[in-house]
A protein has these predicted regions:
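Acidic/histidine-rich helix-loop elements
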Residues: 1-13, 96-99
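Active-site gating/metal-coordination segments in enzymes
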Residues: 38-135, 139, 200-203
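Mid-to-C-terminal alpha-helical segments outside catalytic/metal-binding sites
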Residues: 9-30, 221-222, 226-233, 240-279
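Catalytic pocket-lining loop regions of alpha/beta-barrel enzymes
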Residues: 100-233
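Divalent metal-coordination and catalytic microenvironments
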Residues: 23, 47, 60, 87, ...
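Active-site neighborhood of phospho(di)ester-bond hydrolases with catalytic His/Asp-centered motifs
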Residues: 32-35, 61-62, 88, 150-152, ...
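Short, acidic/polar
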Residues: 12-22, 68-79, 183-184
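Short, electropositive alpha-helical surface patch
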Residues: 43-57, 141-147, 218-225, 251-257
């Protein structure tokens, strides 16, 4: 994953200073900052520097190459020097026939170190390998029960990465399913009994659901009923998904409006803080 030209330049200040200013403006104490690997590759230098500069405000989530034999030692060394929030795994390109990035012998060493360091591992899927990757992830979660496994964009079909050149995919390429199943197929439902599996609901989900005329609050309520409200967390995707933070936060509150007060707090704050910040 050597990086690529972005779909569009971020329309918010994505520097560490800009992020902290945004946090101050919205009275946010801490955030997880996730490496934007499809642009910057596996070089996590800036996000690590930002977290060192603002250790009480920014928690780094690193994107690593699990096929690289040096990754486990790299993670141990970095964890000795500063607090890490977690890691994220993604295929470097859309290849439906290879899961080396997730389940190879080398990748198992990275999973082992994640369990050793108590780091959550987030995973994101391309459309073409989604089914095989979810099946593999279920096996891996069982092998490493001490690792919180976080599926980005819930793992539903409309939350996958568009396969093809790194260009903006039109929303018409995604066809979310409404009631009664809301895109939760048997693959995702089958993860409900794996207690170290968690599901990140993001602005990408909300944008695509809204484009299809599907109420986001009904979607999140259904996720809570099927997967468990304590397994859900919100991710703003600010800096990746275009648009300012405020409307994204408003959309998240709207999506959480059918949750109970306790479920809402867990979804919008507590579950993510517990997994990534030990809060």
């Amino acid at each position: 994953m050597g990086g690529a030209k972005p779909q569009a330049q971020p329309d918010v200040d994505t520097s560490a200073e800009g992020l902290v200013a945004l946090m101050d403006a919205h009275e946010i104490g801490q955030v997880c900052a996730v490496q934007r690997a499809f642009i910057y590759g596996y070089d996590n230098s800036y996000i690590l520097d930002a977290a060192r500069a603002y250790p009480d405000r920014i928690t780094p989530v690193l994107v690593v190459d699990a096929t690289d034999a040096s990754t486990p030692s790299l993670l141990r060394r970095l964890a000795d020097g500063q607090r890490l929030g977690g890691i994220r795994l993604s295929a470097p390109r859309a290849n439906p026939f290879s899961l080396d990035w997730l389940e190879s012998p080398a990748a198992m060493e990275t999973w082992q170190v994640a369990e050793e360091l108590r780091l959550p591992v987030a995973v994101i899927f391309f459309r073409t390998h989604r089914e095989r990757a979810i099946s593999a992830l279920a096996r891996i979660a069982g092998r490493f029960p001490g690792v919180p496994v976080v599926i980005d964009h819930v793992g539903v079909p409309h939350g996958t990465i568009y396969d093809g050149e790194y260009v903006a995919a039109p929303e018409s390429e995604f066809h979310p399913e409404g009631a009664p199943n809301f895109d939760l197929d048997e693959l995702v439902r089958g993860l409900a009994d794996i207690r170290n599996m968690f599901f990140k609901v993001t602005s990408i989900n909300f944008r695509r659901l809204t484009a299809a005329g599907i109420p986001t609050a009904s979607f999140v309520r259904h996720l809570a009923d099927v997967l468990g409200a304590d397994r859900l967390m919100w991710g703003s995707d600010v800096g990746q998904t275009l648009g300012p933070y405020g409307p994204k936060a408003d959309a998240a509150r709207l999506a959480a409006s059918e949750l109970s007060p306790a479920e809402r707090v867990a979804f919008l704050r507590d579950t993510g803080a517990r997994l990534y910040m030990n809060a």
